[in-house]
């Protein structure tokens, strides 16, 4: 997703505050955002206390059962994308957690959550 240069180059504020502000701006400017045929990004927040960058999605109702069934494959895909996305380098260097929360479009209930921790996305040494 979009990561503006201001996060990576801003001075003065502490990193967590900048990341929180960046998430709020992303939500205001770009959400909701259609990610693909079945997924909409609703909002992004940064939980400073948990040091977790959270993305909230809505899944098309007919896609929820298949997505839930393939949750491990979804996690693997998200992990690979994060590992290979250089724009998140500074955030990953700070050992931030990433959380992906998926809700059912038909009723708003939680479908599932995927959490990636530094051990998931950092290269094995």
Question: Whereabouts are the PLM-identified features?
Answer:
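A short amphipathic beta-strand at an alpha->beta junction
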Residues: 82-110
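Post-signal peptide N-terminal segment of mature Sec-exported envelope proteins
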Residues: 20-40, 44
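Short edge beta-strands and adjacent turn/loop segments
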Residues: 35-61
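Sec-dependent signal peptide recognition
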Residues: 1-4
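Short, non-transmembrane amphipathic alpha-helical segments
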Residues: 65-90
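C-terminal motif of bacterial Sec signal peptides marking the signal peptidase cleavage site
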Residues: 7-10
């Amino acid at each position: 997703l979009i990561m503006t240069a201001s996060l990576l180059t801003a001075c003065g504020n502490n990193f967590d505050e900048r990341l929180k502000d960046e998430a709020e701006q992303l939500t205001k400017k770009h959400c909701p955002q259609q990610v693909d045929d079945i997924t909409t990004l609703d909002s992004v927040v940064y939980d400073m206390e948990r040091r977790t960058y959270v993305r909230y999605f809505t899944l098309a109702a007919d896609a929820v059962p298949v997505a839930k069934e393939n949750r491990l494959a979804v996690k693997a895909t998200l992990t690979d994308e994060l590992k290979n996305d250089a724009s998140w380098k500074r955030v990953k260097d700070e050992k931030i957690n990433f959380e992906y929360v998926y809700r059912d479009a038909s009723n708003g209930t939680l479908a599932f959550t995927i959490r990636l921790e530094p051990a998931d996305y950092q290269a094995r040494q």
